[in-house]
């Protein structure tokens, strides 16, 4: 069975009950393009001591826990977008920002086709929920709530942990 089918079937049933501005019909004859999004796996430190990574509890559908992020605005660089989104969503200033991977599977978000540029960064303060986040919190990597993650964020975090453990040598996913 298609990997995306099972995971997003439940999302589909939730989505059909939610009114979404993004679900409006495109202009006839307009070219359809994926939506560009960005996320950051934020490593939180207390001085030099690693505390865990930041996750959010989404405040609107699709609900669940997620890596913080959002859409890149027209005229904005991906790097500026991820910094803006982290200020708006979790009230953090990023340090040592590095591009990690690009995720572009068309079914990664059941609402629309999106291309996500994922980064890794450091922060030296605790997150605070804002914007779309109902909650923002730090989770130890051993306590990641795998079954509660939205979108393809379990895959992204598995890739991150592989990279951190040395099982993947490239920051950019092949």
Model-based region annotation:
Residues 1-9:
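Bacterial N-terminal signal peptides that target proteins for export
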Residues 9-18:
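Bacterial N-terminal signal peptides
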Residues 25-53, 68-71, 120:
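Conserved N-terminal beta-strand and adjoining loop/helix that marks the start
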Residues 35, 104-127, 160:
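Active-site-adjacent beta-strand/loop module that shapes the phosphate/pyrophosphate-binding cleft
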Residues 49-89:
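Conserved Nudix-box catalytic region and its N-terminal flanking loop in Nudix hydrolases
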Residues 92-102:
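A short coil-to-beta-strand element that immediately follows conserved catalytic motifs
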Residues 120, 128-162:
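NUDIX/MutT-family hydrolases
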Residues 156-174:
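Charged phosphate-binding loop/patch that engages nucleotide di/tri-phosphates or the phosphate backbone
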């Amino acid at each position: 069975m298609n990997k995306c089918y099972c995971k997003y079937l439940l999302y589909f049933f939730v989505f059909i009950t939610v009114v979404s501005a993004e679900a409006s019909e495109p202009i006839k004859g307009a070219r359809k393009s994926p939506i560009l999004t960005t996320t950051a796996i934020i490593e939180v430190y207390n001085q030099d001591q690693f505390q865990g990574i930041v996750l959010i509890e989404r405040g609107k559908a699709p609900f669940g826990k997620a890596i913080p992020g959002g859409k890149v605005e027209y005229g904005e660089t991906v790097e500026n977008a991820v910094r803006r989104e982290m200020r708006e969503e979790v009230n953090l200033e990023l340090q040592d920002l590095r591009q990690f991977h690009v995720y572009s599977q068309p079914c990664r978000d059941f609402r629309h086709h999106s291309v996500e540029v994922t980064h890794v960064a450091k922060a030296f303060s605790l997150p605070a929920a804002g914007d779309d986040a109902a909650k923002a919190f730090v989770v130890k990597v051993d306590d990641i709530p795998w079954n509660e993650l939205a979108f393809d964020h379990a895959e992204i975090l598995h890739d991150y942990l592989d990279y951190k453990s040395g099982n993947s040598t490239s920051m950019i996913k092949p």
